[in-house]
C-alpha cells in the first residue's frame, strides 16, 4: 500500500543508516550503533539482499527521498546497488559522507543514479577536526582538502549539501567564506546532539547551550544557504532506519526502536514511532530535492 501518496501527513523522506562501520571517530556522532552491534547485529550491517529488500519496501510504501547514511555508507561494498535500486524505484537519492572514500570510480559509477552528495564538514581547520575525531590516520581535512573534494563532486554533476555540527570545538569559527565559495544548495547547521547509548563517553566536553548555538547561527545569519536545527528541532522529525532494519527515533535522549521492517512490514513498524510531521515541515524538511 502506497501510504504516503494517499494524502496523509506522513514525512516523505527517510534516512537509512545501513552501515555501522566508519573510518573516522567523531566524538559527537549520534549514530555509532554500538548498542545494536553488541546485541543483535555483530557485523554492524545486514546482508546485501536484506538491505535491497528494505529499500524496495520503503519505496513501495511511498517514501520520495532516501538518504543513505552510516557510519560511513561508502564503505558498504554494495552501496552503488542500493543507490541504483532506489533511483529506479523512483526515489530521490542522497548519501551523507565524510568524503574520505569518494573515489572517482564511485562518482562515475553512480552518476546516473545518485542525485545528491551531502558532505559532513564541521571545520576547515585540521587541528579542530583532529580534536573531534573528524580525521583518519592519513586524512586530516582542511580547507584545501574540502575545496578539492567539492570541485570534484561538481565536475561529475552531483548536487551538493553540507552538514555542520556545532560543538565547543568549532563554536567560534566562521565558515561564511568557505560556504559561499562552495555554493551548496543547502547548508544545514546542527546543534551537537547528546544521545544516551551513542555518544555518552565523549560528548560532555563538546556540548553547547542553545544560546551558544544561536551565537554561531547569528555569525552566519546572512548566508543564503543556511538552514539551522537545534536539538528540539531535530527531535521526532527524522524518519530513520537503523543498520538492523528497524525504524528508530530519539525520545527523551534515548533511541527507541521499532520491530524489524522485514518481519512486520513498513507500515506496522512505522506506526510504532512518534514522528512529528508538523515539526518536520517547520524545520524546512520539504524542499526542491527532485
Curated annotation (Swiss-Prot):
An annotated Gene Ontology molecular function: lyase activity
Superkingdom of origin organism: Bacteria
GO biological process, one term: defense response to virus
Pfam family, one: Radical_SAM
Keyword Transferase included in the entry's annotation: no
Protein EC: 4.2.-.-
The protein's required cofactors: [4Fe-4S] cluster
Reaction(s) catalysed by this chain's protein: UTP + AH2 + S-adenosyl-L-methionine = 3'-deoxy-3',4'-didehydro-UTP + 5'-deoxyadenosine + L-methionine + A + H2O + H(+)
Entry keywords, A to Z: 4Fe-4S, Antiviral defense, Iron, Iron-sulfur, Lyase, Metal-binding, S-adenosyl-L-methionine
Keyword flag Lyase: yes
Protein role: Expression of pVip47 in E.coli (strain MG1655) confers resistance to phage P1; has no effect against T7. Catalyzes the conversion of uridine triphosphate (UTP) to 3'-deoxy-3',4'-didehydro-UTP (ddhUTP), probably via a SAM-dependent radical mechanism. The modified nucleotide represses transcription from T7 RNA polymerase-directed genes (possibly by acting as chain terminators), strongly suggesting these nucleotides block viral polymerase transcription. How this protein allows bacteria to resist viruses that do not encode their own RNA polymerase (such as lambda, P1) is unknown.
NCBIfam families cross-referenced by the UniProt entry: viperin_w_prok (NF038283)
PANTHER family assigned to the protein according to its UniProt record, in alphabetical order: RADICAL S-ADENOSYL METHIONINE DOMAIN-CONTAINING PROTEIN 2, S-ADENOSYLMETHIONINE-DEPENDENT NUCLEOTIDE DEHYDRATASE RSAD2
Similarity-based family: Belongs to the radical SAM superfamily. Viperin family.
Protein name: S-adenosylmethionine-dependent nucleotide dehydratase
Amino acid at each position: 500500500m502506497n501510504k504516503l501518496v494517499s494524502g496523509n501527513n506522513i514525512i516523505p523522506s527517510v534516512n537509512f543508516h545501513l552501515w555501522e562501520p566508519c573510518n573516522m571517530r567523531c566524538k559527537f556522532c549520534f549514530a555509532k550503533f554500538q548498542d545494536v552491534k553488541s546485541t543483535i547485529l555483530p557485523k554492524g550491517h545486514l546482508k546485501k539482499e536484506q538491505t535491497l529488500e528494505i529499500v524496495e519496501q520503503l519505496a513501495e510504501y511511498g517514501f520520495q527521498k532516501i538518504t543513505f547514511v552510516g557510519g560511513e555508507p561508502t564503505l558498504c561494498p554494495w552501496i552503488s546497488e542500493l543507490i541504483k535500486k532506489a533511483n529506479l524505484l523512483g526515489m530521490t537519492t542522497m548519501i551523507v559522507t565524510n568524503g574520505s572514500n569518494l573515489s572517482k570510480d564511485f562518482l562515475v559509477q553512480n552518476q546516473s543514479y545518485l542525485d545528491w552528495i551531502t558532505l559532513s564538514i564541521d571545520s576547515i581547520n585540521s587541528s579542530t577536526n583532529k580534536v573531534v575525531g573528524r580525521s583518519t590516520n592519513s586524512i586530516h581535512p582542511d580547507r584545501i582538502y574540502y575545496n578539492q573534494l567539492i570541485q570534484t563532486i561538481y565536475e561529475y554533476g552531483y548536487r551538493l549539501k553540507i552538514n555542520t555540527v556545532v560543538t565547543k570545538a568549532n563554536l567560534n569559527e566562521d565558515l561564511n567564506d568557505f560556504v559561499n565559495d562552495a555554493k551548496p544548495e543547502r547548508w544545514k547547521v546542527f546543534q551537537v546532539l547528546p544521545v544516551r547509548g551513542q555518544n555518552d563517553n565523549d560528548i560532555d566536553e563538546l556540548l553547547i547551550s542553545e544560546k551558544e548555538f544561536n551565537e554561531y547561527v547569528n555569525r552566519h545569519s546572512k548566508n543564503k544557504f543556511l538552514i539551522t536545527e537545534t536539538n528540539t528541532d531535530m527531535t521526532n522529525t527524522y524518519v530513520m532506519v537503523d543498520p538492523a532494519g528497524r525504524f528508530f527515533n530519539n525520545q527523551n535522549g534515548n533511541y527507541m526502536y521499532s520491530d524489524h521492517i522485514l518481519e512486520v512490514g513498513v507500515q506496522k513498524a512505522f506506526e510504532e514511532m512518534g514522528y512529528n510531521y508538523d515539526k518536520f515541515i517547520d524545520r524546512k524538511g520539504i524542499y526542491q530535492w527532485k
